[in-house]
């Protein structure tokens, strides 16, 4: 008589639990985050490639067949790689292949087409989180891990897998913030040379992020904040060598960030305004800016220009992320009560670290939300938000708090958990829309 092995329910749950520990284990963050990243990206990739046909908009096919009648193109022979070339990525790919040929292509970050990088911002975000909140206690490790995991399922969705600027911007901006936070920690231990070198390195990365996406210029708030911190010392003690040298490093860092915006504009000015042809209208502006001109002319971007009735659905689509950005910015101002949750047994390391940086990041994130609401195509905030870590920390802290409360109150519904589920569902739905070249962009 043959023997049949039957797994008990408890054995099945143990196997599932073991699998869960492999996938989500804050004690092994690098491995766990890499596995989660691979699984989520594979799912997004699968959803996009199974979308049938050329898509609602057939502009992508012009990259491959610029002179052919699209009715002759067999969708089955359409390269899978071009399924990721949708919306603005058509401009990125064309500029990467041929350079900046058309005026409107200058609306898309000059830095991106000159440097294509793999997305590593998830792991950098984990290290940044450790710098801010510490990584000594189980609660701190969980917060840092969850924050990085949330970055994987960012509402940017398919844009982080396609030839768009969001992935590289996230990497550069978060890496810049990591070096900036390391500079702050060195300042606390009086390592001045290391502090200044890391501050300048952070400025270089944020400047590169600005060359990829113009909203990176908001990183200059960090340096403006640092400069203002020097004023009380100057007023109370007067100028000293230490204060002057510190202020010089801060101002130099701010100028480096400004170069990320100014250099592409200078290159465009030479290309369009210093020729024998009739100069473009923007060449005569007090501060010539091809970026501002093409945004206004070709995309109708400007203060309250997007506030028209047909765009109401797009505002509704953006509202959850806008609310999350503003709510988490306000959360960061409640610094003592927030960081004390992660300072156990009288330890104040997390409080000291977060006190230096969270309010500054709150200013940046709040400015981004206000600009998106008043002056951008508002729906792009769903992807712009991917490069700003504050809301990841807020949502991770809420998940931890809700889980703790559910254990004591037997409450099953968690608003933070529902928010995470909504982000994941949105990411999958957006992958379908993206693969079919359907809005929103």
From Swiss-Prot:
One of its GO terms (molecular function) is mannosyltransferase activity. Its EC number is 2.4.1.-. InterPro entries: PIG-V/Gpi18. One of its GO terms (biological process) is GPI anchor biosynthetic process. It comes from Aspergillus fumigatus (strain ATCC MYA-4609 / CBS 101355 / FGSC A1100 / Af293) (Neosartorya fumigata). One of its GO terms (cellular component) is mannosyltransferase complex. The keyword Transferase applies. Keywords: Endoplasmic reticulum, Glycosyltransferase, GPI-anchor biosynthesis, Membrane, Transferase, Transmembrane, Transmembrane helix. Belongs to the PIGV family. Mannosyltransferase involved in glycosylphosphatidylinositol-anchor biosynthesis. Transfers the second mannose to the glycosylphosphatidylinositol during GPI precursor assembly. This is GPI mannosyltransferase 2. It is a multi-pass membrane protein. The keyword Transferase applies. The chain crosses the membrane at residues 4-24, 35-55, 115-135, 143-163, 165-185, 199-223, 249-269, 306-326, 361-381, 418-438. It holds the Pfam family Mannosyl_trans2.
């Amino acid at each position: 008589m043959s023997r049949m092995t039957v797994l008990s329910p408890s054995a099945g749950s143990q196997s599932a639990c073991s699998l869960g520990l492999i996938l989500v284990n804050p004690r092994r963050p690098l491995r766990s985050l890499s596995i989660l990243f691979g699984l989520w990206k594979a799912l997004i990739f699968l959803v996009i490639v199974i979308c049938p046909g050329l898509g609602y908009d057939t502009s992508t096919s012009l990259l491959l067949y610029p002179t052919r009648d699209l009715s002759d193109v067999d969708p089955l022979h359409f390269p899978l790689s071009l399924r990721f070339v949708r919306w603005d990525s058509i401009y990125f790919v064309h500029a990467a292949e041929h350079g900046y040929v058309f005026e409107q292509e200058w609306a898309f970050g000059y830095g991106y087409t000159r440097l294509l990088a793999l997305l590593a911002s998830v792991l950098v975000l984990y290290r940044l989180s450790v710098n801010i909140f510490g990584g000594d206690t189980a609660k701190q490790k969980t917060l840092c891990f969850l924050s990085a995991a949330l970055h994987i399922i960012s509402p940017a969705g398919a844009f982080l897998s396609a030839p768009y600027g969001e992935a590289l911007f996230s990497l550069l901006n978060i890496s810049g913030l990591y070096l900036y936070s390391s500079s702050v920690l060195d300042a606390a231990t009086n390592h001045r040379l290391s502090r200044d070198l890391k501050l300048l390195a952070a400025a270089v990365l944020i400047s590169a992020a600005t060359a990829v996406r113009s909203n990176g210029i908001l990183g200059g708030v960090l340096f403006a904040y640092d400069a203002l911190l020097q004023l009380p010392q100057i007023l109370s003690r007067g100028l000293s060598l230490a204060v002057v040298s510190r202020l010089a490093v801060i101002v130099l860092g701010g100028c480096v960030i400004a170069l990320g915006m100014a250099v592409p504009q200078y290159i465009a000015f030479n290309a369009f305004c210093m020729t024998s042809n009739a100069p473009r209208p923007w060449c005569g502006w007090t501060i010539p800016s091809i970026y501002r001109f093409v945004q206004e002319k070709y995309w109708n971007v400007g203060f309250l220009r997007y506030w028209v009735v047909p765009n109401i659905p797009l505002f509704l689509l953006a509202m959850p992320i806008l609310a999350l950005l503003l709510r988490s910015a306000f959360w960061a101002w409640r610094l003592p009560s927030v960081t004390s949750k992660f300072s156990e047994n009288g330890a104040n390391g997390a409080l000291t670290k977060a006190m230096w940086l969270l309010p500054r990041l709150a200013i940046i994130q709040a400015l981004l939300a206000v600009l998106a609401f008043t002056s951008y195509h508002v729906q792009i905030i769903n992807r712009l938000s991917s490069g700003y870590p504050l809301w990841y920390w807020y949502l991770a802290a809420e998940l931890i708090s809700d889980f703790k409360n559910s254990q004591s109150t037997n409450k099953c519904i968690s608003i933070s958990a529902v928010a995470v589920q909504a982000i994941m569902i949105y990411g999958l739905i957006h992958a379908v829309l993206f693969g079919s070249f359907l809005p929103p962009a």
